[in-house]
């Protein structure tokens, strides 16, 4: 593990986001937002917090709570308590998911290269999930630990490398959720895990979703989603794209063909086994790996 300080690692890659019309980002803050950010940091410092107080991290909590300082404080405090209780701060070295090569075939999840905005692209083939078989070799608790492990690997390794390659701060991912082959039974079996996984992402990794594509969505899925849209934040809704079976043209608008696997309509010719375990991206390229080191793996190759 690196002995460099967090400040030194942060200084090794861009901290200013790409230019945007949206305010609340390091590249576009109003005077009022700058003041709110300073007050937020000061109050957290007075509460005894010392870590994760950089501008980008704090702004994610503020954006998630519409720049309401007290709500952002409550969210931050709850997150820090969860990190301590769950062992998040040491999970990258403490947790080993040696069963992953087998689990991955029953619930394929993997990162593969980047989208046009420099985000790491995360694929999840939910339609292939076989929870009954999976629970014979792992547990839901270990699945959730692996999820958190991957979140931490993304935040500490993938995003810094992607930021160096892009030339600006990349703080979100692009997710492609493949629903091909999903059945009522498989969806029902995995709903408990999905619910817990969604809560972790929403409560403890705010503002990490850049783009979210649901492909091969069954008939009626879009209609059902429309019923929930009024209850969702408009910014969140704008990031979600529900696509049917003719998704390739839309997906290629966001992901370069050379980065999108052939199986999803791109030109990246890679086998399923390599997709599951190779973890290809800037975080494996020496040119973009910084003082944090190469992204670790939760299992031995």
Curated annotation (Swiss-Prot):
Tell me a GO biological process for this protein. Answer: negative regulation of phosphatidylglycerol biosynthetic process
An example Gene Ontology molecular-function term: phosphatidylinositol transfer activity
- What Pfam families does UniProt report for this protein, alphabetically? CRAL_TRIO (PF00650), CRAL_TRIO_N (PF03765)
Keyword Lipid biosynthesis recorded: no
Q: Which UniProt keywords apply?
A: Golgi apparatus, Membrane, Protein transport, Transport
Membrane protein topology class:
Peripheral membrane protein
Subcellular location, record wording: Golgi apparatus membrane
Q: Any one cellular component term from GO for this entry?
A: cytosol
Task: Name the domain of life this protein comes from.
Answer: Eukaryota
Q: Cross-referenced Gene3D superfamilies, in alphabetical order?
A: CRAL-TRIO lipid binding domain, N-terminal domain of phosphatidylinositol transfer protein sec14p
List, alphabetically, the InterPro entries matched.
CRAL-TRIO_dom (IPR001251), CRAL-TRIO_dom_sf (IPR036865), CRAL/TRIO_N_dom (IPR011074), CRAL/TRIO_N_dom_sf (IPR036273), PI/PC_transfer (IPR051026)
Cross-referenced CDD domains: SEC14 (cd00170)
**CRAL-TRIO domain location:** 99-272
Tell me, in a sentence or two, what this protein's role is: Required for transport of secretory proteins from the Golgi complex. Catalyzes the transfer of phosphatidylinositol and phosphatidylcholine between membranes in vitro.
- According to UniProt, the name of this protein is SEC14 cytosolic factor
Q: What is the lineage of its organism?
A: Eukaryota, Fungi, Dikarya, Ascomycota, Saccharomycotina
- Point out the gene that encodes the protein: SEC14
């Amino acid at each position: 593990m690196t002995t460099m300080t967090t400040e030194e690692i942060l200084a090794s890659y861009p901290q200013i986001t790409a230019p945007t019309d949206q305010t609340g980002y390091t590249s576009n803050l109003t005077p009022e937002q700058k003041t709110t950010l300073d007050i937020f940091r000061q109050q957290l410092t007075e509460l005894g917090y010392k870590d994760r107080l950089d501008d980008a991290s704090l702004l994610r909590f503020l954006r998630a709570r519409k720049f309401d300082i007290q709500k952002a404080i409550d969210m931050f405090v709850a997150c820090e308590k969860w990190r301590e209780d769950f062992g998040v701060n040491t999970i990258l070295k403490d947790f080993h998911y040696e069963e992953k090569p087998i689990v991955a075939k029953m619930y394929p999840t993997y990162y593969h290269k980047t989208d046009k905005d420099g985000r790491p692209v995360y694929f999840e083939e939910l339609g292939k999930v076989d929870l009954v078989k999976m629970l014979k070799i792992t547990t839901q608790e270990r699945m959730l630990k692996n999820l958190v492990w991957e979140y931490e690997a993304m935040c500490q390794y993938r995003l810094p490398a992607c930021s160096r390659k892009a030339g600006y701060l990349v703080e979100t991912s692009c997710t492609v959720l493949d629903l091909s082959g999903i059945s009522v039974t498989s969806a029902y079996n995995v709903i408990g895990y999905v619910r817990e996984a969604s809560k972790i992402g929403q409560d403890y990794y705010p503002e990490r979703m850049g783009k979210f594509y649901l492909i091969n969505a069954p008939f009626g899925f879009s209609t059902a989603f429309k019923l929930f849209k009024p209850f969702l934040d408009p910014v969140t809704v704008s990031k979600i794209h529900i696509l049917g079976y003719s998704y390739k043209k839309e997906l290629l608008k966001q992901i370069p063909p050379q980065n999108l696997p052939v199986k999803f309509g791109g030109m990246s010719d890679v086998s399923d086994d390599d997709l599951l375990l190779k973890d290809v991206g800037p975080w494996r390229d020496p040119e973009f790996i910084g003082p944090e080191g190469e992204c670790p793996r939760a299992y031995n190759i």
